[in-house]
Amino acid sequence: MSSDTIIGIDLGTTFSAVSVVKGRRPVILPNKQERIMPSVVGLSPKGEWLVGTPALNQWALAPESTVRSIKRDMGTDRTVALGKHTFTPQDISAFILRELKRVAETHLGHEVQRAVITVPAYFTDAARQATKDAGQIAGLEVMRIINEPTAAALAYGLDREEDQVVLVYDLGGGTFDVSLVELVSGVVEVRASHGNTRLGGDDFDDLLAEHLRQAFEKQHGVDLRHDRKAMARLNRAAEKVKIELSTHPFAWAREEYLAEKGGKPLHLEVEVNRREFEGLIGDLLDSTRTSIQQALTDARMTTKDLDKVLLVGGSTYIPAVWELVTDATGLDPRQEVHPSEAVALGAGVQAAIIAGQPIDAILVDVTPHSLGIEVAEMTWRGWVDDRYSVLIHRNSTIPVTRENVYATLYPEQDTIELKVYQGEQTIASKNTLLGEFKFTGLKPEREGELAKVTVQFSLDVNGILQVKTHDRGSGRETGITATAMKERLSQEQISQAQKRLAEASPTLALDAAGEALVGRARKVLEGAELKPESAQDLVEALAMIDKARRLGDEPEMQTWLEELADLLYELED
């Protein structure tokens, strides 16, 4: 496997993973013993940057210095503060992507520069472009953005000879998608998608944490809502209970010294049974049933057309999810590909296809949203504005190009303001505004007539929109990427973000053996009569370990840990 390798990345809300294809099969590249990595970034009290498990471990203790679930803010103008630093969602995602890049490079033994990254099928155009920007900040050329349920179907369908229609139900930590996919002779064709980019395990945790908070207040008379650290610990307890309830009928939520009253410590100890939990999340789960039906309707299918139902995402371990999907489809769900790894594995397959590896699969995807512009329509009452004219309808196969001709409202009009929207509402302003720009200097084809403009939408394989306009009178054209008009980072901003990321190197965590080794060395330095040269060797080894950790250089860190072990063996013998 050469430096031309393209890696596949599942950039998840709560967990992320990286994969490649080896021997015609996709494999997860683990980070030490972890096959999936928490999508968490933090700044330690010592000013060290933490990514993954080390950041997650500090979250309950220092929520103000830790960022989780940043994926939900991709494509927005929200910023987050860590210490003295202010970051965009793209910046935080770049921390995670850089760590996954490092994991891949450690396994492959060479630099990695290209990637395929997955996103929810229902991600907006702006969120998709933000994901590409995050990859660029992390030093990755993003070769393709593909939808998560599509990636899972690609992993599932690899080398399967039988033709089948598969419903992919993808419920992760922060987003939900359902897709209808046809697998025919190595072609993976998406027929329809539907979903919700703000529905997942995080929401279940929040509901259960609120249930625990109310139980704690009822028992102790203390309201924890304004105690950020206590609420983070409640959320952590809720997540543990949720996971345990997937395999047990009841579970205990326990957190010692959660608060104090009158100088006395107060502990959380609440039992939750599975029926209670299912009651809390019932309405959210029911909303996914609507998405299943909508996807079937859009694909012009019924449940009788389905051959398989594939469950993807960590939240599909919840028994109530299985029951709902079985009831909604009439089929027993399958988990033939690991639910938490399926998306990353599919990304690895798509990456291998782009890299030219001999993979017998072709991916055909769709756009989940309609795309159009605001227009005015003539009615019996006169002109009515804020109407929505759709150029590309939802569930159109991508890539796709569509165009339409629009006229000005009156002969002398030489300027139009083009507002580009994404959504399904007939009132334009009720949809998501992707951007707007002015087109001036319009000329009619013949004097006294209305000027006419051809508007062309081109949606590429990444689901990113290009808009072109053509003045039929003057022949002048203009073109722009829709997201360049709204929330997209400029090239200068990306360069600045790359510089910030380079300066904010994550500190590698030591495992238990490494911590013990460093601790032994420090005790030897403090308590033993050492020759100056021996003490100097120990000090140098500790300094080099610390430097490698700060630089995120794991091979160098391991080399110096081995050197330290040899030194201690000689000194302690």
Label each region the model flagged.
Residues M1-T76, V80-T86, F95, A104-D573:
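Oxyanion-binding/catalytic loops of NTP- or PPi-dependent enzymes
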Residues R98:
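Conserved cytochrome P450 K-helix/beta-meander segment immediately N-terminal to the heme-binding cysteine loop
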